[in-house]
Design a protein with these regions (language model features):
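Conserved catalytic cores of phosphodiester-cleaving nucleases, focusing on short active-site segments
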Residues: 1-29, 35-40, 105-138, 144-145
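Short, solvent-exposed polar/charged micro-motifs at secondary-structure junctions
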Residues: 71-74, 108-109, 181-182
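Redox- and metal-dependent alpha/beta enzyme cores, enriched for Fe-S-associated oxidoreductases
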Residues: 87-111
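Surface-exposed beta-loop interaction hotspot
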Residues: 47-94
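Short, aromatic/basic amphipathic alpha-helical patches
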Residues: 26, 45-56, 155-165
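A short acidic, often aromatic-flanked loop/helix-cap motif at beta-alpha or helix-coil junctions
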Residues: 66-71, 127, 175-180
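Gly/Ser/Thr-rich loops at beta-strand to alpha-helix junctions
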Residues: 41-44, 151-153
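Alpha-helical oligomerization segments
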Residues: 132-184
Length: 184
């Protein structure tokens, strides 16, 4: 319950892979929900599923997103802050023709006169071997891991493992520069 503003209904799940069929089942059964909150810290949800929820005026996110949603006074769709930051940077980049959110972490970027790139955006404080391996297991298809958290770092071991998997790894600032090159 909000201290100030409209009341809202939340549906809570705990899934690592959030399928559109599951979400449609929830939305069809509980027609008055405003947000679906996933307890799992690491999860995957497709861009198609996110778009479906937004078409129904339903927000989706983790527990932090639920807290942010509850501090609003209305039930407007909440876009996760990290993707809002990423999309603004990509929209403003002169080499980016367009981009598509494939899921909650991966973005397919179409560039002018250069090959498309699929990047996974990680907001981890430190990108470790585990970050690389778990991302590869969960998200499978991508060419580069982009560290969007300006704090912390990327371990040398993570760079080695990423290299053996033919995955590049860099910070957000370095990635924006790489978008101008033929690197992939």
């Amino acid at each position: 319950i909000r201290k100030k503003g409209l009341t809202f209904k939340v549906f809570t799940i705990s899934l690592e892979d959030v399928e559109i069929s599951t979400v449609k089942e929830i939305v069809n059964k509980y027609t008055d929900i405003n947000i679906i909150a996933n307890i799992k810290k690491v999860y995957k949800i497709s861009g198609e599923t996110i778009n479906f929820l937004h078409s129904k005026n339903i927000s989706f996110g983790g527990m932090g997103d639920l807290m942010r949603f509850s501090s609003q006074e209305d039930n407007e769709i909440t876009i996760d802050k990290e993707f809002d930051y990423i999309s603004r940077g990509l929209r403003q980049h002169l080499q980016v023709k367009s981009f598509e959110r494939l899921d909650n972490r991966r973005v397919k970027i179409k560039r002018h006169d250069l090959k498309d790139v699929i990047a996974i955006m990680l907001n981890d404080y430190e990108i470790s071997v585990e970050s690389v391996r778990s991302s590869k297991d969960l998200y499978k298809d991508f060419q580069i891991i982009v560290k969007t958290n300006p704090n912390g770092g990327i371990t040398s071991e993570a760079k080695v493992i990423a290299g053996t998997l033919n995955i590049e790894i860099c910070t957000w600032g370095d990635f924006l520069g790489k978008l101008n090159t033929f690197w992939n």
